[in-house]
Amino acid sequence: MAEAHQAVAFQFTVTPDGVDFRLSREALRHIYLSGINSWKKRLIRIKNGILRGVYPGSPTSWLVVVMATVGSNYCKVDISMGLVHCIQRCLPTRYGSYGTPQTETLLSMVIFSTGVWATGIFLFRQTLKLLLSYHGWMFEMHSKTSHATKIWAICVRLLSSRRPMLYSFQTSLPKLPVPSVPATIHRYLDSVRPLLDDEAYFRMESLAKEFQDKIAPRLQKYLVLKSWWATNYVSDWWEEYVYLRGRSPIMVNSNYYAMDFVLIKNTSQQAARLGNTVHAMIMYRRKLDREEIKPVMALGMVPMCSYQMERMFNTTRIPGKETDLLQHLSESRHVAVYHKGRFFKVWLYEGSCLLKPRDLEMQFQRILDDTSPPQPGEEKLAALTAGGRVEWAEARQKFFSSGKNKMSLDTIERAAFFVALDEDSHCYNPDDEASLSLYGKSLLHGNCYNRWFDKSFTLISCKNGQLGLNTEHSWADAPIIGHLWEFVLATDTFHLGYTETGHCVGEPNTKLPPPQRMQWDIPEQCQTAIENSYQVAKALADDVELYCFQFLPFGKGLIKKCRTSPDAFVQIALQLAHFRDKGKFCLTYEASMTRMFREGRTETVRSCTSESTAFVRAMMTGSHKKQDLQDLFRKASEKHQNMYRLAMTGAGIDRHLFCLYIVSKYLGVRSPFLDEVLSEPWSLSTSQIPQFQICMFDPKQYPNHLGAGGGFGPVADHGYGVSYMIAGENTMFFHVSSKLSSSETNALRFGNHIRQALLDIADLFKISKTDS
């Protein structure tokens, strides 16, 4: 394999004969091409910035306005009502005239036309922002759309009809509104009523009233002031205090995973699958840089914020003693690869051209064929990213701030993303229920040192060609990486393809230089720190119980026959399953998005409601008529859907209380109410996994082209983490996590309760898979 010095532009040594310079032509060539590529990207960004800045206008529309003004002037019609002549008189004459009077008139008309054009764009964007601030459509039934909503929809379509770029709507998105304190307090008390007895509820009610009357008004004023100044009053604090200031390991506690297609297999060649996948990812990055990706649109017309996509690639979480830092680079031309305890650098470009899939396959195969042993301390080095953040920050500062260690660490942290070549094989075998769970655990934490948990995402390649992702959470939420993953899997399957022998299409360029081994000089003291982090991470990973399963009896198609939303159906089933599992209700977290607002991220839906608990209790008694149970279920479903809509439209509970708590800390004001609210454990943390954000193939035509979604670790010591994907008309996937050290939880047991709860609710409506 090539040595590390190939990556250095020049070296020099002092000899008795003078100074000896050694130039690396390959490195200098890469530096030159990198500079050329950077300038190309800058020009593209400038062009995109102009096009984005004038949306929904365009250079063509500007030219039309100018031509209309000039044409009317030659027809002796003054559409400017004298403004052109006023502009002409105001033209500066300090440095002489602008030529003939006709030239001055033409210049004045161009200035007038540009002003009219810019004013029109401004009015269009403000009108669009006002229209996008309307959310009444979310609270109406599809069959009973009001006239106001119909008119609103027509106006939105007219104003956004021109083909938008990825960030075209960013400045037209409304700001996240700050809810009123009384409204938030009322919704909070309503959410905890089913969880507290009368005495505990009256106590909480008293604390809430004291907070609302005495402390909250002052905190709210500061928060409203921030909402006027900041783009989003929540997102920066959420990123900093929930993610970057966390000092516990991010492996399991924060990072989450995503699975490959599990019902089909494109190839068993590990290197070939990676070649196609990495090529597809860089294709996506190129589209991202050029803003060629269509923004995600609700109902095909309401744009979602695309801000989180900016840091998808070339991003690393840098550890700090008190808080971490997200480092994002505008460009990266390589990936970092881990295999059998060794780290490699793989270039993605040959000159200015992206390597073809077959070339990338060859490079990855060279790594797989390499038999060189790891250097001392290299094998478990990545365990530093899996342990405590303070320990990692101290080790990084002490052992990786200079020399070859710094150079190699920079190579990893400046990579487009991280690639892990695993030695184990994983796949989903319907006849072996444990296979999906083992696959999930491998993606969630691996062996604690074969993932670089600080990278924005790690692409994981199993020996048999199966893939997966491990994603760092602070830079974005699951729908963002899901958008990339959908593109990659569809591109790999339907656009790039494989030969009959399972290799990438085409012939490799054998003249490409081989991947470069990274060089390390890790002293024993650092190796001790690595081992300590590994032991912390291993204890954490060994304590995770993960149960993943496919639910086959029915899917979205059958649930719709219950006249309820699939998400509400599953959430109510989770409440029934949890009560059967523990004999009690608990504070339940469901992640909702606020991306209809600029730089919006998530909000919490408190799924355990008085209506859902009433339904569960009625189900448990076994003495209620089916019609009564159906009515209770529909009430619970309607309540859940309404709460979800409120959360999406900025009227949630928890982000507002969280920000009030942060303000109270800044002001040094203590609130017993906020202290208690923010310390409540989420014993059941849930999330629905998005799918089909991109339409690259027809899922009805290819029903087996389904991923199994993804999952995350348990949030509470004695709680469950549940992610689910309503994968199609006839199936669902669930990922249930808990801690083995807890005597209260068992992921397998809870998963079986979920299965039975889904079947029992479906039985209420007398529907089966044959009906869907």
UniProtKB/Swiss-Prot annotation:
Tissue expression remark: High expression in heart, skeletal muscle and brown adipose tissue. Also expressed in white adipose tissue, but not in liver.
Pathways involved: Lipid metabolism; fatty acid beta-oxidation
Signal peptide: none
Binding-site residues, (R)-carnitine: Y589, T602
Transmembrane region(s): 48-73, 103-122
Active-site residues from the entry: H473
Positions annotated to bind CoA: G555, K556, G557, L558, I559, K560, K561, C562, R563, T564, S565, P566, D567
Pfam families: Carn_acyltransf, CPT_N
InterPro entries membership: Carn_acyl_trans, CAT-like_dom_sf, Cho/carn_acyl_trans, Cho/carn_acyl_trans_2, CPT_N
This protein's GO CC annotations: mitochondrial intermembrane space; mitochondrial outer membrane; mitochondrion
Annotated GO MF terms: carnitine O-palmitoyltransferase activity
Disulfide bonds, paired cysteine numbers: none
Record localization: Mitochondrion outer membrane
Keyword line: Acyltransferase, Fatty acid metabolism, Lipid metabolism, Membrane, Mitochondrion, Mitochondrion outer membrane, Transferase, Transmembrane, Transmembrane helix, Transport
Entry's family note: Belongs to the carnitine/choline acetyltransferase family.
Purpose of the protein: Catalyzes the transfer of the acyl group of long-chain fatty acid-CoA conjugates onto carnitine, an essential step for the mitochondrial uptake of long-chain fatty acids and their subsequent beta-oxidation in the mitochondrion.
Protein name: Carnitine O-palmitoyltransferase 1, muscle isoform
